[in-house]
C-alpha cells in the first residue's frame, strides 16, 4: 500500500492518500477544495489515477474537493450512507467493508461530532491505522455543539469504537492545530485532556459544554456546499467562488 498524509493550512485539515499497488486504485480521504490541484499533481508524479474520494462527515470548516475531483478524474465519491446525499456515488456503513483493490477499509459509525460521522479502520497483520475524522483528535476531540452533535454520543463512540482497539493502533485525525501528525490509541486513552485518563461521562459532558468556541468562519457556506459534495452555494465569498467547480451534469 502507498500512503501519504497531506495538509491544508487554512483549515488545518489532513487529507490522506491510499493506493493499492497491485490494482492501481487510489483513494483520497477528506480532500479540500483549495488543494485539489496539489493532490492531482502528486498523483501524477506517482503515476497514480484517482478512483475514489471518501468523506468522514459533512465538514463545517472547509469546502470538500470531492466534486471538483470527480469532474476532473471521473472518480467515485463515497461517504456515510446516513447522510443520504444524491451527489455521492457510494454510501458506506459499518459492517460493510470498503474495498480498494487489496486494501480493506472498515467503516466505524462514530456519531457525536456530527450525527452521521464515520471513521475508517485499516487493519492487517503488520499494523492498524485509524482515520478518525473529527471524532478523535490528538490530545483533543471534535466539538459537539452543532450539526446535531452530542457529547454523550461522542463519549460512547470513542470508548466503544476507538478505545477498544489495540494500544499501538496509529491514529490519523482530520485536523491538528499544533503541527502534530498522528498519535496512538494508547496515548489518547491515557493522556487525552478531554476524554483520556478514565474521565467519566459526566466530566466529559462538563468539559464539552464549557468550551464556548466560536463557530467555524466558513460554516455558513461550507455545510450547504458540502451537502452538494463541494459545489459552491450562492453565499460563498467571491475569492472562494473562483476555485469552485460545477459538476458535469450541472
Enumerate the predicted regions with their spans.
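Active-site HxH/HxHxD metal-binding segment of metal-dependent hydrolases
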Residues: 12, 23, 33-109, 128, ...
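Conserved beta-strand hairpin/beta-sheet module of binuclear metal-dependent hydrolase folds
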Residues: 1-49, 120-133, 139
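Short clusters of hydrophobic/aromatic residues that line enzyme substrate/ligand-binding pockets
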Residues: 92, 98, 144-146, 185, ...
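Accessory terminal helices/loops
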Residues: 156-170, 174-250
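A contiguous binding-surface segment within folded domains or other stable secondary-structure elements
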Residues: 105, 114-164
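Small/polar loops that bind or transfer phosphate-bearing groups
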Residues: 6, 27-31, 55, 102, ...
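Active-site metal-binding loops of divalent metal-dependent hydrolases
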Residues: 31, 58, 82-83, 113-114, ...
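Hydrophobic residues in well-ordered beta-strands that form the structural core
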Residues: 29, 77-79, 131-132, 173
